[in-house]
Amino acid sequence: MKSLSILEDVRQACLLLTEFTRGKSFADYQSEALLRAGVERVFITIGEALTQADRLESGLGNVLTGLRQIIGFRNVLVHGYAVVQDATVWGIVENDLPVLKQEVDRLLAQGGGP
């Protein structure tokens, strides 16, 4: 699979986000500029990596839940940064990140193919 190393980058980024947010609350996220900047930066990396992987692997959108939304979120963070809501980012950390990590882990365990 051509995108195996890219998926590994996504997995590492998911682990980094988990580390950044471990033991943190939404109030912490709102009050810590460095945490917000770090989390948003890693989400940009995930979105860009998945954009590249999607170009290499047809069918990736069939096995990664919300692939288009993840890529779209990256675009909002980069181009629409002034409208990014803390609650939206935190909701993605809590609800969507674990799903993405699980699905990427499964793809990597299967050799990366959709």
PLM feature spans:
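Solvent-exposed interaction patches of small proteins and small membrane subunits
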Residues: 1-114
